[in-house]
């Protein structure tokens, strides 16, 4: 059996994954005051992770520890893509609400983190324009140069 603290840790880890997925889009909005379609994959991943939290892993107080994943989660060649649901439209609406709640909560966390670290964000944007990609050491060095620390969320 999962203890409450273990369940909370697992939810926190998944929340962090979603916060990271949303970070690029939010940073783009903060830095350029505009958004592009570049973050479409990140948004898809964030949404899938939030939906999995609700439908597969039972991380929803509203719905409880019930698996609501559909049989179409794994699509095979030659099989039509559809959504055979084993739950009501009302439950589907609650699932959508829970997914939206998780995404919104993670969006707020990502926005807060990026605003609190705006100097680092601006330097990171400059560095990425120059190099396109950076490694973990370069990323962490940005925080050290600006007397910031990477804290646990």
Language-model regions: role of each:
Residues 1-2:
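Short, exposed "boundary/linker" segments that immediately precede the start
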Residues 7-10, 14-153:
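Soluble catalytic regions of large protease machineries
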